[in-house]
């Protein structure tokens, strides 16, 4: 704990006696914290009750005397409309920068749509190519630290995951371009804005280099999970270049698939998910989607349309989320600076949006830190979870 005069210096410059004094004080503080009997779960980015209450109007948008038809005359209570309500697709079109007729709506989970997309590539192939399961060992690029649930999907299918370091500009594109020369590399996971957990937003050049990729594998897919596209925390939000437009310029639009949802906009358990891509890729996905379902939850889509109206309505709602979230980020960042600033034993992100602060402690210490937090009643994401196979090679990264 940063409580003594000597602790304003980097710890590596301190004497053994100074370090021992800090250790003893830290242990006393730790035992006091343990005695409080706390039970605090910070393992996932879960919206609080106050955030969920911001979208209660979704539940009030429909009632027994409502008009249940959309602008095309489709009765939203019935079967049909395989790709989802046009009005909801138009909202996502504004947010994602892809034409509405190149968007498929799902139910509440974009992760499920990602899983289904990987599953289709594995069992039936991408774009008419041989299914991945018949090509021997296939591989996926995994910018790391990254999203553990992405890695869980590729691990589930036995796809070999290749970690790629995250830089301040996004994934190491030199490495990605080199690895893509291998035809067994079939795709790359991406969280391009306020990346989970680093908070990095991909630079314009990184987005353009993704668009310029010409992988050896013709069935390579960029899984572009734009989960935090409107989740800004400051007056100067990060700007993300539209990858679809860049891919169109390069003639590579078939290989990018964009995902998003209203999970952290309205309700995580009852929102609307979306998938966007080129007309050709959407047509190939339609073949599977129309076998899988006769249509997603149109009543929920209609509720969201009536509540949100358009992309401006989404952005207005997100201001309420910011008012609740930004002070919480400030509490965490102030505590890190107060307790660890200047000691040379940790570094952390200061994101402009998203849901996470990324903390790097000294090499070999992350598991121990997370374990000590657990003993004190604070549950964090497991150390290592932000890397493929749960293996942080440095045992240093912690997602807060």
Give residue spans per PLM region:
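PLP-dependent enzyme catalytic core of the Aspartate aminotransferase-like
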Residues: 1-2, 16-22, 68, 80-82, ...
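Conserved C-terminal alpha-helix-loop-beta "cap" of PLP-dependent enzymes
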Residues: 23-34, 281-282, 286-287, 292, ...
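Hydrophobic "anchor" residues on beta-strands that sit immediately upstream
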Residues: 187, 221-222, 257
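Short, solvent-exposed loop/turn segments at secondary-structure junctions
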Residues: 45-49, 110-111, 146-148, 169, ...
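Conserved core of the PLP fold type I
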Residues: 74-218, 229-251, 366
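Conserved glycine-rich beta-strand-loop-beta hairpin in the small C-terminal domain of fold type I
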Residues: 41, 319-333, 345-360, 369, ...
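Conserved core segment of the aminotransferase class I/II
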Residues: 245-326, 339
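N-terminal "arm"/small-domain region of PLP-dependent enzymes with the aminotransferase-like
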Residues: 2-83, 93-94, 375-378
């Amino acid at each position: 704990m940063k409580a003594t005069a000597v602790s304003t210096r980097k710890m590596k410059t301190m004497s053994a006696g100074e370090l021992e004094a800090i250790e003893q004080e830290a242990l006393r503080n730790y035992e006091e914290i343990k005695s409080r009997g706390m039970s605090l779960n910070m393992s996932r980015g879960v919206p609080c009750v106050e955030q969920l209450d911001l979208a209660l109007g979704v539940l009030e948008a429909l009632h027994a005397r409502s008009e249940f038809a959309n602008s095309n005359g489709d009765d939203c209570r019935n079967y049909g409309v395989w790709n989802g309500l046009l009005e909801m697709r138009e909202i996502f079109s504004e947010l994602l920068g892809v034409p509405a007729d190149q968007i498929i709506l799902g139910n509440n989970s974009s992760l499920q749509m990602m899983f289904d997309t990987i599953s289709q590539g594995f069992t039936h192939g991408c774009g008419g190519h041989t299914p991945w399961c018949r090509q021997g060992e296939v591989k996926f690029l995994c910018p790391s630290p990254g999203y553990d649930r992405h890695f869980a999907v590729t691990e589930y299918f036995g796809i070999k995951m290749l970690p790629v370091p995250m830089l301040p500009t996004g994934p190491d594109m030199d490495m990605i371009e080199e690895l893509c020369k291998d035809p067994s590399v079939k795709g790359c996971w991406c969280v391009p804005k306020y990346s989970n957990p680093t908070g990095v937003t991909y630079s314009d050049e990184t987005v353009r280099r993704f668009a310029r990729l010409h992988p050896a594998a013709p069935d390579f897919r960029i899984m572009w999970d734009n989960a935090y596209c409107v989740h800004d925390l400051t007056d100067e939000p990060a700007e993300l270049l539209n990858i679809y437009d860049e891919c169109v310029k390069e003639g590579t639009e078939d290989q990018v698939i964009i995902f998003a949802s209203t999970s952290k906009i309205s309700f995580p358990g009852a929102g609307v998910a979306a998938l966007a891509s080129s007309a050709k890729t959407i047509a190939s996905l339609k073949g599977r989607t129309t076998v899988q379902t006769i249509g997603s939850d149109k009543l929920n889509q209609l509720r969201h349309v009536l509540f949100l109206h358009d992309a401006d309505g989404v952005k207005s709602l997100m201001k309420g989320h910011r008012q609740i979230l930004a002070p919480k980020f400030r509490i965490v960042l102030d505590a890190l600076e107060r307790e660890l600033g200047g000691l040379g034993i940790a570094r952390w992100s200061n994101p402009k949006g998203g849901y996470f602060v990324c903390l790097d402690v000294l090499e070999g210490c992350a598991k121990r830190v997370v374990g000590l937090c657990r003993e004190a009643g604070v549950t964090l994401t497991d150390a290592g979870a932000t890397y493929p196979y749960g293996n942080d090679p440095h045992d240093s990264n912690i997602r807060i």
